Amino acid sequence: MTAFTQIEKSAAVPAPTDFGIEGMTCASCVRRVEKAISAVPGVASATVNLATERASVQFTGAPDTGGVLLAIEKAGYEPKVIIQEFGIEGMTCASCVSRVEKALRTVPGVADASVNLATEKGTVRFVSGVDVAAIEAAVRDAGYDVRKAKASGATAEPEDRRELETRTLKRLVILSAVLTLPLFLVEMGSHFMPGVHEWIMENIGMRHNLYIQFALATAVLFGPGLRFFRKGVPNLLRWTPDMNSLVVLGTTAAWGYSVVATFASGLLPSGTANVYYEAAAVIVTLILLGRYLEARAKGRTSQAIKRLLGLQPKTAFVAHGDEFVEIQISDVVVGDVIRIRPGEKIPVDGTVLDGNSYVDESMITGEPVPVQKAAGAEVVGGTINKNGSFTFRATKVGGDTLLAQIIKMVETAQGSKLPIQALVDKVTAWFVPAVILVAVLTFAAWYVFGPSPALTFALVNAVAVLIIACPCAMGLATPTSIMVGTGRAAELGILFRKGEALQSLREADVIALDKTGTLTKGRPELTDIVPADGFEADEVLSFVASLEALSEHPIAEAIVSAAKSRGIALVPATDFEATPGFGVRGAVSGLPVQVGADRAFSGVGIDVSPFVVEAERLGNSGKSPLYAAIDGRLAAIIAVSDPIKDTTPQAIKALHDLGLKVAMITGDNRRTADAIARQLGIDEVVAEVLPDGKVDAVKRLREGGRKVAFIGDGINDAPALTEADVGIAVGTGTDIAIESADVVLMSGDLIGVPKAIALSKATIRNIKQNLFWAFAYNVSLVPVAAGVLYPLNGTLLSPILAAAAMAMSSVFVLGNALRLRSVNPA
């Protein structure tokens, strides 16, 4: 083997792809990972290094990055993956989206890529060893410009760029119109106004008239219209035509034919030396006008994000010594003490140190009533202080603030693809090539079978087919509705963390609710304590509260609060043990103490039947009975009640009005749960459920093919939120519940659930309207442009009318999507 052959062969072998891996601790881990990766189809070899925590993988063909990542995860380790957002400029239709996604996925180390036409962004998931420059190069090689998007919530730069694009298009439209108008008047006036034709013949002459038309049309085509050529021609040469390519083919055909008719008319058959300069120019002008209107409409679709970005102030007054100094918000760090005066926006999240005021949190929660803030209260960046003044300590800054997280959630939802878009992706993959084929067949059919002059008919109809086809409308149909719908939801305090929830929420048949903190305020109150014979109420409460002081459960807080309000002193407890769903046990003053539900006592030989009548009475009144045992003897029955939220009855009624069944899942005993269900009109009750049994409860509700949306707020709700078809977290709940959810209600108000469902239905309905329009437009008008009506009634579609129709089709889709901004679900 020669050196040249060796070099040639080595060059043909693709470079290995590196994967970062976390969690390996020994050589056994290395072998396990190597074995898992080697089992992935297409992997030639895998070498794992424990010290560097990296795997070098050699593929036989195209890298299956996603397969390797999945294999690492299944082996029990965590691959190091980066998710980076890129801005992509120059996309005009769904074919562009498909092309960019395909280009990105061919980059070694890229696991997945999702591109959104409406936001002009691509989200790329790749392994840590991938050079970002390679990803950017792939986009540029596909024929588009790329830039790395900045951190979420940091800047409004994409909007500035969109405004610049809108202004540029406006200038191009004006320039193109100025050049096209005289051309249009001269050509059309000659046809419809005999006086104009005579004036041109006498003062300009036919030959000079053609030269003027040529000059004006050429200026339009290669001036304002040059943007179509810059994108369309390279894509044609790559055999990946897009909408720009259709415009280039159509206008160039009309212009080129006219040039031949002007300067070499002898090459054309007799009677066919007609010019179509005005058609080429008007097509460019109308399509530019459509792009301009489209750009303006796109800007309005992202108004929600712009408003969220505008909530954040630019500066903050931070304590430096004995004075407060104004600094840039980017310079604020955790721990800074910040002063807020009346009317000012709160710059970052924090905890109030001193002062008292009311804060307008409507832009975050959707609730119009200002919330009182005093020492110890949490404040959120972006909210507006009303009439008081206070200082607070910054706890979250930059991308960690709630506002930044909300913006990120909205952007993520806006950039997602719904299942309904799968058909669109399949169609748009072959749409443009199919249109070009139809145009070629149209030209051939008219040239062979058409009336005289056949060449003229063939050219005009083929150009009309190329121009009228509009893949843009199909590509924009879904993402624009998602953008506006999720943005409107954010304004109402409803965050769709996953775009798919927009579609799945409307399909829900059952709304399952956790009780505590969801139906109720989550702040239980001690209402009753009935001691057994030989015990005093305050004595029992002292033992019980001393034990419960070590628990973080809301019921424990209620018991401790009641003891303190009665002036009962607490003593240290030992041997504390909590069993979720049962209760707590420990020792107080050397005596064993146990507090919990009736099921907690059956296994320890303590009979709670003496309180059966009392338990029934308390349960029927909607209170939760608990039992207390001291030194192995039943000491008392205790009742706590968690007040129902004021808006819960209204929310349940609204869900019923939507035709939904409402179910409650609770750990309360059956009697208490049934009492609350009767009070609220809840259809189905799953009671006495242990925390880890909520998943099974959701599964039971799903029997028979029913779709279930589960609403919860606590840590123990997270598995059920994940199991449900749609998980809805109450925004006042725990972080883990919110992370597990598909939808977040920022206000913690259940009335947001019917609002979210109504928005889901409105958005999907809007998407279907857009898709129907986009498909119906192309399916019906492409044949008309080809001339199928000519044999019936002599109707042909002018390329100029085709351009106008195409330009307006995308504008119609965007305009329809913008209607979602005015949706106001009750």
Curated annotation (Swiss-Prot):
Protein EC: 7.2.2.9
Recorded GO MF terms: ATP binding; ATP hydrolysis activity; copper ion binding; P-type divalent copper transporter activity
Location(s), subcellular: Cell membrane
Domain HMA: 15-80, 82-147
Entry keywords, A to Z: ATP-binding, Cell membrane, Copper, Copper transport, Ion transport, Magnesium, Membrane, Metal-binding, Nucleotide-binding, Phosphoprotein, Plasmid, Repeat, Translocase, Transmembrane, Transmembrane helix, Transport
Residues involved in Mg(2+) binding: 713, 717
CC annotations in GO: plasma membrane
Binding site for Cu cation 1: 26, 29
Catalytic residues (positions): 514
Biological process according to GO: copper ion homeostasis
Record membrane topology: Multi-pass membrane protein
Catalytic activity of the protein: Cu(2+)(in) + ATP + H2O = Cu(2+)(out) + ADP + phosphate + H(+)
SUPFAM superfamilies xrefs: Calcium ATPase, transduction domain A, Calcium ATPase, transmembrane domain M, HAD-like, HMA, heavy metal-associated domain
Enzyme superclass (EC): translocase
Transmembrane segments: 172-192, 209-229, 246-266, 270-290, 429-449, 457-477, 772-792, 795-815
InterPro entries named among the record's database cross-references: ATPase_P-typ_cyto_dom_N (IPR023299), ATPase_P-typ_P_site (IPR018303), ATPase_P-typ_TM_dom_sf (IPR023298), ATPase_P-typ_transduc_dom_A_sf (IPR008250), HAD-like_sf (IPR036412), HAD_sf (IPR023214), Heavy-metal-associated_CS (IPR017969), HMA_Cu_ion-bd (IPR006122)
Top-rank taxon, per record: Bacteria
Residues given in the record as Cu cation 2 binding sites: 93, 96
Predominant place of localization: membrane
Stated family: Belongs to the cation transport ATPase (P-type) (TC 3.A.3) family. Type IB subfamily.
Role noted for this protein: Involved in copper transport.
PANTHER family the UniProt entry points to: ATP7, ISOFORM B, P-TYPE CU(+) TRANSPORTER
Protein name from the UniProt record: Copper-transporting ATPase 1
Organism: Rhizobium meliloti (strain 1021)
